[in-house]
Swiss-Prot record:
Protein name as it appears in the record: Chaperonin GroEL
Class of enzymatic activity (EC top level): isomerase
Assigned EC number: 5.6.1.7
Binding positions for ATP per the UniProt entry: 29-32, 86-90, 413, 480-482, 496
């Protein structure tokens, strides 16, 4: 494909136009009185949302230079969303302000490399100040207040606080559609996976078609169980104890399945066979998770273990196992607490290191099943469009609340950035900066005013008036845009997670530095649309 190239000011101005078009669309959603944006879809109903990253993903500009500028800001929103789960609009507003302030100086002749160094130093100093002034989340009410602000809905805040109180920070809170109007909250106890019994003959409770095993042995194997000989040997080990048996394997077929069913029907011993969840390496990892949770050892050819020669030491244990047609739940596995904690730490490290959104999601599901549990918030609304919009807000609020638990809280409404910058501006390290590095730092101190001004503007109040007033207030006090009053924001429950605020600034500063130091842009040349065939062509007359 042919390329087009732009240099210096032409390159930067083309990218800036794309950045502005995206940022101006996103920033109208900022704050408690921010507006929604309607996203047209190629199929189905349109989506109405105030989620910055969802809006950014839908914007695809025609001009190639503008598209590149917009893509850079999309990266700010996406990275902030990946790390903190919220703050995408704040990050976009900060990036726009940093780039505009920086380009003024580049046009005036400043060295962009020196400006970038100053931006990085000031941003790092503000992040340190934000972390130092964070307030730990100590109560369920604080979680509820944080989630309420993110979702703009007190009922949602209460449900999320209840969910996280139950499943813990490592637990998973999922959001699903509800058949009825309103919000419902369900909890899953223990480790649950989406595989049920292989045969309905394993059912012990005819009323709800489930198989319930009390204090069972648990046999985990990575291969298929097909041989009658294997089952006979396992049955001999289990029958000595009189306990029921759960078998989780790649599959149970051949002679093995009818042998198990026949023993179950005759009452020789109570057993249930279930297929292992997942595929390939993910299945192996999940079997190992179950082994650690229950104190079992996975019977695998890789380890030189075969079913016809195992002893009872490979069995795991649990207080109860409940198996339905579609899912299996293991309650209170008997594995070592230390082993479970080590496995949890390993999965956390994998989450930190993966670049794949899909892998991250699957790892978080595994983490929740080991460390916490699963809570499901079911959302119902009058229309499909309203339900989708509410689900988006709840998903953001869940991640916001988790971020608050992880790194603590700050005064919200953009106040924390302004007050942290005011402190950092007077610090010895920043005062010692000189020349264009000092100019770069000054760019950051002006840019961090953008979120509070935008929140005020979206509330119908002058941003400059609010900013000047907040500068005069004691630390922690600021503008509550929901009520248009000045008060102690932490006491009023107007808070932002530190993780969200710092991630927004760090990612915005990173992209702004790249933007300012760009000297040329190589873009794909737009293709001319193919000429339409003339009427009557190739008709033979």
């Amino acid at each position: 494909m042919a390329k087009i190239i732009a240099y210096e000011e032409d390159a930067r101005q083309g990218m800036l136009a794309g950045l502005d078009r995206l940022a101006n669309t996103v920033k109208v959603t900022l704050g408690p009185k921010g507006r929604n944006v309607v996203l047209d879809k190629s199929y189905g109903a349109p989506t109405i949302t105030n989620d910055g990253v969802s809006i950014a993903k839908e914007i695809d500009l025609e001009d190639p230079y503008e598209r590149i500028g917009a893509e850079l800001v999309k990266e700010v929103a996406k990275k902030t969303d990946d790390v903190a789960g919220d703050g995408t609009t704040t990050a976009t507003v900060l990036a726009q302000s940093l780039v505009h302030e920086g380009l003024k100086n580049v046009v005036a002749g400043s060295n962009p490399i020196a400006l970038r160094r100053g931006i990085e130093k000031a941003s790092e100093a503000i992040v340190k100040e934000l972390l130092a002034s964070a307030k730990d989340v100590e109560t369920k009410d604080q979680i509820a207040a944080t989630a309420t602000i993110s979702a703009a809905d007190p009922e949602v805040g209460e449900k999320i606080a209840e969910a996280l109180d139950k499943v813990g920070q490592d637990g998973v809170v999922t959001v699903e559609d509800n058949n009825k109007f309103g919000l419902d909250l369900d909890f899953t106890e223990g480790m649950r996976f989406d595989k049920g019994y292989i045969s309905p003959y394993f059912v012990t409770n005819a009323e709800d078609q489930t198989a319930v095993l009390e204090d069972p042995y648990i046999l985990l194997t990575s291969g298929k169980v097909s041989s009658q000989q294997d089952i006979v040997h396992v049955a001999e080990l289990v029958m000595k104890s009189g306990k029921p048996l759960l078998i989780i394997a790649e599959d149970v077929d051949g002679e093995a399945l009818p042998t198990l069913v026949l023993n179950k029907i005759r009452g020789t011993f109570n057993t249930v066979a279930v297929k292992a969840p997942g595929f390939g390496d993910r299945r192996k990892a999940m079997l190992q998770d179950m082994a650690i949770l229950t104190g079992a050892q996975v019977v695998s050819d890789d380890l030189g273990l075969k079913l016809d020669s195992i002893d009872a030491s490979v069995f795991g244990h649990a207080a109860k196992v409940i198996v339905s047609k579609d899912e299996t739940t293991i309650v209170s596995g008997a594995g070592s607490k230390e082993d479970v904690e080590a496995r949890v730490a390993q999965i956390r490290a994998e989450i930190e290191n993966t670049d794949s959104d899909y892998d991250r999601e699957k790892l978080q599901e595994r983490l929740a099943k080991l460390a916490g549990g699963v809570a499901v918030i079911k959302v119902g609304a009058a229309t499909e469009v309203e339900a989708k919009e509410r689900k988006h807000r709840i998903e953001d609020a869940v991640r916001n609340a988790k971020a608050a638990i992880e790194e603590g809280l700050l005064p919200g409404g953009g106040v924390a950035l302004v007050q942290a910058a005011a402190k950092v501006e007077k610090s010895a390290d920043i005062v010692a900066l000189s020349g264009e590095e000092a100019t770069g730092a000054a760019i950051v101190f002006r840019a961090v005013e953008a979120p509070i001004k935008q929140i005020a503007q979206n509330s119908g109040v002058s941003g400059d008036v609010v900013l000047n007033k907040v500068r005069e207030l004691p630390e922690g006090e600021g503008f509550n845009a929901a009520t248009n009053t000045y008060e102690d924001l932490l006491a009023a429950g107007v808070t932002d997670p530190v993780k969200v605020t710092r991630s927004a600034l760090q990612n915005a500063a990173s992209i702004a530095g790249l933007f300012l130091t760009t000297e040329a842009v190589v873009a794909n040349k737009p293709e001319k649309p193919a000429a339409a065939p003339q009427a009557g062509a190739e008709m033979g007359y």
